[in-house]
Amino acid sequence: MVGAIASFIINHEKISCRGSKDDDDLIISIKVKSLFNASATSYVIPTNSYFRTKMDDEYVSPNSVQGAFQIKFFKNNLDELDRLISENLAQQGIVGTDSQDRFGNVKKYPLGTVAKVNHKNKHFYFVAINDVNQYGKPINQSYNNVSAAFNGLLTAIKQFGHCDDLAMPLIGTGRAAIRDATIDKVVRETIDQFINLEDKIARKIIICISPKDYADGKVKMKKISNYLEYRCEFEK
């Protein structure tokens, strides 16, 4: 039996949903906020299927979630980040296929592959959501990429993640350039994914909506709040 209480404060660009499943609490908070300004212990970082971190010529854009992460935490030490990613993939026994891009030989991994990086007492889940060409530009974009990313992410957190406060962007929107991944659609998908979970994998889910998207009028907060309230009520 699932009980839920929904509350939302539109004027502060905040929507929150608190629910309970048996004896477990489920909290979903949706905010207009930059991901790394969210107070959390774990974060989701969408990445390319090469797990490349190169920022030369914006292979990884500084304006992307991954780029912002790298500048904030590994600005002068991307080699260490590469090592941590490769080490975790190897620990999972995941072996990529041989490929090449403008930087040379590289391993390619299936969409939905997750590498967990621990850094400064926080956990970062890199999830492959897009194939890219030799210059790092997304190719073969499909909404199926979003589904694959969610499946891989939720499985990874359940298997080797941490049950804590998890902050995530709207995966598939923005730099991923997946046409069908509209803000409204991905918000709904994210809410549904976590409300439908049978297993508790986090104490709190913080879904971060880009302040730029909000400023550009791409976000309908009232519509989002109504859907969140509906899902919470539906699960009572």
Model-derived segments and their meaning:
Residues M1-K236:
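Macrodomain-like recognition of ADP-ribose-binding/processing modules
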